[in-house]
């Protein structure tokens, strides 16, 4: 009964991990619809205004036939332009719905499985691992490798390559000292960023201002003041302290001696890295993406199931080679949680909750403090070809007499 419960698939827990799989296409569909709606509203307003002016001028005789024809040509051109834009939005909507259908079908496959022993579960689990690996690589800039894996596994509709490629491009531009693409992204998502109370646009405008001051010439100083009046002053109510510091930077240039730390921080080259990080955080929050890669979440869950209070310790083991050769000492981890690859990730996860204990019968305590079941010691001694009355530690290889062993439970 216990084995059956352990092998049973918990569909709710799987869906918790795979929430972003459905959420991102949904958020992108909303964004696509808002963009299409804005285009229709904007172009319709312009067309209606021009149509009314043309009709009124034509009826009043104030507009010549040539101007009427010219206005009609302008309206036709605008309509064609709007049609092209709407076609682009329609194609994007079709792509996103196709993506969403594929992801729902992928999750529906899991709903038909009820045990990890199902032959189909291994293939499904492998596909999910591939998805998590692509997500991890895209988040860390390994775009070529991520695309290669997605192509090999034929799972383009299950991963968000285009979204992360766009994010990666803007992040790299910030790391290379350019705010142009990031500001364009902020302009496209102005309303949403305002709802999230994001300060990204303000930080980008401040960086533009700082770069003008860094040049430290009279013409650039005037340009910086003009920039501050237009783009930084409107944020005075939201970020009063930062705006005052921006004004003070006019009197504190990066070449000044004994530059106060708070002003030196604004001129630090590290600010580009911080801006890139701020952009990624705003991007993920806007699209409802997790802060950390889903691979970390999945690994943390598995690590927590294995972690015990004995973890993060090491045990020195001594292995002896053939007679006459020196002994070598090596340090091996007690469990996989303590391995170099997983140690850091496992540090902050909780310990496993075990409601049932599984102990061998007739536990025996070895002189080195290790405990094993008698059956295991007997089996290992037979395999090792030990003399009668001797046992061997399964980990360290140390040999002891049976008389030196103590029963754990009398």
From Swiss-Prot:
It is found in: Cytoplasm; Nucleus. Keywords: Cytoplasm, Metal-binding, Nucleus, Zinc, Zinc-finger. Residues 314-330 have a biased composition (Polar residues). GO terms for cellular component: cytoplasm; GID complex; nucleus. One of its GO terms (biological process) is negative regulation of gluconeogenesis. It comes from the Eukaryota. Disulfide bonds: none annotated. Residues 125-157 form the LisH domain. A zinc finger (RING-Gid-type) spans 335-396. Residues 163-220 form the CTLH domain. One of its GO terms (molecular function) is zinc ion binding. Pfam families: CTLH (PF10607). Residues 310-330 are annotated as: Disordered. Its main location: cytoplasm. Belongs to the FYV10 family. Involved in the proteasome-dependent degradation of fructose-1,6-bisphosphatase. This is Protein fyv-10.
């Amino acid at each position: 009964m216990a084995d059956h419960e352990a092998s049973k698939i918990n569909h709710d827990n799987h869906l918790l991990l795979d929430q972003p799989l459905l959420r991102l296409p949904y958020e992108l569909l909303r964004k696509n619809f808002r963009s299409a709606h804005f285009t229709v509203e904007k172009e319709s307003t312009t067309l209606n205004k021009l149509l009314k002016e043309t009709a009124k001028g034509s009826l009043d005789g104030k507009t010549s036939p040539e101007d009427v024809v010219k206005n009609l040509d302008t309206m036709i051109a605008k309509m064609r332009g709007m049609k092209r834009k709407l076609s682009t939005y329609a194609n994007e909507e079709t792509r996103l719905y196709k993506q969403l259908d594929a992801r729902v079908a992928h999750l529906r496959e899991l709903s038909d499985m009820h045990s990890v022993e199902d032959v189909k579960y291994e293939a499904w689990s492998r596909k999910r691992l591939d998805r998590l690996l692509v997500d991890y690589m895209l988040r860390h800039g390994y775009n070529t490798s991520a695309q290669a894996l997605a192509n090999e596994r034929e799972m383009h509709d299950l991963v968000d390559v285009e979204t992360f490629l766009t994010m990666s491009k803007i992040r790299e531009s910030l790391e290379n000292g350019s705010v142009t693409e990031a500001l364009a992204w902020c302009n496209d998502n102005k309303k949403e960023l305002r709802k999230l109370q994001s300060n990204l646009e303000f930080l980008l405008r401040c960086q533009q201002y700082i770069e003008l001051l860094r040049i430290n010439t009279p013409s650039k100083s005037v340009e910086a003041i003009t920039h501050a009046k237009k783009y930084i002053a409107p944020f005075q109510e939201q970020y009063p302290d930062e705006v005052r510091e921006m004004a003070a930077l006019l009197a504190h240039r990066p070449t000044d001696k004994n530059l106060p730390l708070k002003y030196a921080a604004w001129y630090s080259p590290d600010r580009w890295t911080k801006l890139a990080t701020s952009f990624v955080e705003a991007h993920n929050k806007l699209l409802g993406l997790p802060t950390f890669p889903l691979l970390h979440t999945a690994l943390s869950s598995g690590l927590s199931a294995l972690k015990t209070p004995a973890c993060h310790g090491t045990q020195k083991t001594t292995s002896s080679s053939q007679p006459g050769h020196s002994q070598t000492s090596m340090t091996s981890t007690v469990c996989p949680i303590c391995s170099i690859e997983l140690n850091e990730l496992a540090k902050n996860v909780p310990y496993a909750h075990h409601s049932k204990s599984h102990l061998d019968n007739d536990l025996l305590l070895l002189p080195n403090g290790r405990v094993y079941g008698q059956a295991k010691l007997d089996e290992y001694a037979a395999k090792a070809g030990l003399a009668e009355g001797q046992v061997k530690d399964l980990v360290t290889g140390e040999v002891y007499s049976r008389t030196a062993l103590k029963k754990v439970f009398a």
